[in-house]
Each structure stands twice: as C-alpha cells, then as structure tokens.
Amino acid sequence: MTKTFRNPQLTKNGELKHLLSIEGLSRDMITHILDTASQFVSLSDSDRDVKKVPLLRGKSVFNLFFENSTRTRTTFEIAAKRLSADVLNLNINASSTSKGESLLDTINNLSAMSADMFVVRHASSGAPYLIAEHVAPHVHVINAGDGRHAHPTQGLLDMYTIRHFKKDFTQLRVAIVGDILHSRVARSDIHALTTLGVPEVRAIGPRTLLPSGLEQMGVRVFHNMEEGLKDVDVVIMLRLQNERMSGALLPSAQEYFKAFGLTPERLALAAPDAIVMHPGPMNRGVEIDSAVADGPQSVILNQVTFGIAVRMAVMGIVAGNSD
C-alpha cells in the first residue's frame, strides 16, 4: 500500500498551519499571503494613529533565535505586537540550552508556559520541522531561517517587493548573485520565483559558490557577472557567508568584488528600470558598491518595511488554522 505524503506545513484540509518552507506551497497560497500582507502595509504608515489590530490578542509568541539576528527578529517582534500578541524573546545564551538542555526539552518547557506560536531560527537545517512535528495541534511554528535550508518569510517579502515594483511575475528576468551555495534565502527565492511563474531565473557567481542541481530547478547559471546581468529586471544580491564556509572558497574579498561586485557600471547592463535587492546585512565594497546600495534603483529599505507586513500576514494566517 502506498503511503500518502502530507506536507507537514498544512492541515488535513490543505490550509497553512506552520510556515517551514516555500517549497511545497502552491501559487495560490503564496499569492494569498502576499494579498493579505498588502492589507497590513497601511499599518506602517506614519500618519496612522492606531498601528495595531487584535488578530492575535491573548496569544503568546515566543521568538527562539539560536543564531544572531537583528533585522529578522526585530521585524517578527514588531509584527507580533502589531497583531496584539504577547511576545517573549528568548535569550539563548542565557537559557538552559547553553547548559546542555535539548531543543525539544526547551520546547516542552516553553509549551508548558502556554506558548501559541514559535518563531525559530536555528543553525541546523530541519530544526523547525522537528519542532512542528513535536508541538501540540494548536501550536504554530514559523521558520525564521534554518541552516542552509530555507528562509521562507524572507522569500515571501522578496516576492512582495518584486510584485510591488514589477506587478507581473510572468514577464520578468531575475538574477540572484553571490554565495548561493550557503544561502537559505536563495533557495527560498528560487522556489517562490519558479512557483509564481517567473520565466527566467539566473544564478550568477563563482563555481565554488554555486550548488549543483540549479539547472534542475529551472535556473540558468552564469559565472560571468556582465553576461548574467544583461537585460534583467531584478537583481538580488547576496552576502558572502564566511561563517558557513569551510576552507578557502575565494581568493579575497577584493578579488570577489572585482569579479562579482555590483557597481553602477554593471547595473547599467540590466534593464533601465531594474530594481536592486539585498536580504541584508550588506557588505559594502564586497558584493555591492555603496553607489548602488544607496542609489535610485535600490529597494533594499522597502524590503525591510514590507517584511513587517508579510510576517504579520504569515502569523495571522497560520494562527487561524489547526488540525
């Protein structure tokens, strides 16, 4: 008898109860998240007196960041508070996990404190899946980045940003540039872009920083920056993740910038109205020139702003679905 595989992110009715990866989400589901996020963008308006909605009132959200983060943790905290949730940020270095307590023991103890949602960043790929399999049916898990595997909310906010500026995914050429081998953002972006119907996704980088199997994912591979950027509509720059590299994969940061840094001259090879994105943190003078990062085609700060609304949408959607 054939065993039926069920996506662990979904309820029996196919609704989103956890967000663990963009892989496996339908185009309709991704579009629903983006549409929901658009309703929350107005809450960020500086002219708005009331910036909260009561969607998660009475719910407890635990931010569990086992890796350092500023941008992601802060935007999740703001998102949860704007949904009226009670938020607890666990200080991992001061917690029992640094004294040898297992991940699941930590989850059990926090669940006993009536946690309703865990937002998890972990160095081990698959850690959020393990937690999602372990928690009670009413508890929700959102992956805020696991190892090299996935960063689904970053992928979704990138798609929101692209849709905001470019409207139609089916008419775009998108280039992802840099350390794709170690990038969970790149994996999430590629799955989202192909699911949303982008006809041409390009990966640009040195051979040592591009994983095998990109072509099987429908990605065109370039090892020359000038060739890869020609006529693209969106450029997504990635930082060098030196903390995940084992061994000398590059000669030097200066040599990398010389070959793959995004300069105004190289950006001129893209479409005239191309936008430049970066998930952060940026390494100026390594993967991107300051003139580009701060230039008129950069939408990097828009990504940060939209990230709050997208994370509000994800939290609101999963909180409404349980088995």
UniProtKB/Swiss-Prot annotation:
Any one GO cellular component localisation term in the record:
cytosol
- Pathway named in the protein's UniProt entry: Pyrimidine metabolism; UMP biosynthesis via de novo pathway; (S)-dihydroorotate from bicarbonate: step 2/3
Q: InterPro entries attached here?
A: Asp/Orn_carbamoyltranf_P-bd, Asp/Orn_carbamoylTrfase, Asp/Orn_carbamoylTrfase_sf, Asp_carbamoyltransf, Asp_carbamoyltransf_Asp/Orn-bd
Q: Which residues bind carbamoyl phosphate?
A: R71, T72, R121, H151, Q154, G280, P281
What does the UniProt keyword field contain? Pyrimidine biosynthesis, Transferase
EC number, UniProt record: 2.1.3.2
Q: Which domain of life is it from?
A: Bacteria
Sites binding L-aspartate sit at: K99, R184, R239
Tell me the Gene3D superfamilies matching this sequence.
Answer: Aspartate/ornithine carbamoyltransferase (3.40.50.1370)
Q: Which SUPFAM superfamilies match?
A: Aspartate/ornithine carbamoyltransferase (SSF53671)
Per UniProt, the enzyme's principal EC class comes to transferase
State the family named in the UniProt similarity comment for this chain: Belongs to the aspartate/ornithine carbamoyltransferase superfamily. ATCase family.
The protein's assembly and partners: Heterododecamer (2C3:3R2) of six catalytic PyrB chains organized as two trimers (C3), and six regulatory PyrI chains organized as three dimers (R2).
Described purpose of this protein according to its UniProt entry: Catalyzes the condensation of carbamoyl phosphate and aspartate to form carbamoyl aspartate and inorganic phosphate, the committed step in the de novo pyrimidine nucleotide biosynthesis pathway.
What is the protein name given in its UniProt record?
A: Aspartate carbamoyltransferase catalytic subunit
Q: Which gene encodes it?
A: pyrB
